[in-house]
């Protein structure tokens, strides 16, 4: 089992954890429907950047 050589100080512990924070997801608003979706992803209505790119069950 691994055993640490020296105790890590609170400052070094904080520096080690400095990149662990979670970021909020990048959300975009579809201009045609006003729906919120993840950036670079198709909205639930099948629109991407103002154009219909996928047929949905509601369209059929």
Swiss-Prot record:
Region (Disordered): 1-36
Annotated SUPFAM superfamilies: Zn-binding ribosomal proteins
A cellular component term, taken from the record's GO annotations: large ribosomal subunit
Entry keyword annotation includes S-adenosyl-L-methionine: no
KW tRNA processing (keyword) present: no
GO molecular function: structural constituent of ribosome
Swiss-Prot/TrEMBL GO biological process terms: translation
Keywords (A to Z) from UniProt: Ribonucleoprotein, Ribosomal protein
Annotated HAMAP family: Ribosomal_bL32
Family: Belongs to the bacterial ribosomal protein bL32 family.
Protein name: Large ribosomal subunit protein bL32
Organism (species): Methylibium petroleiphilum (strain ATCC BAA-1232 / LMG 22953 / PM1)
Lineage of producing organism: Bacteria, Pseudomonadati, Pseudomonadota, Betaproteobacteria, Burkholderiales
Gene expressing this chain: rpmF
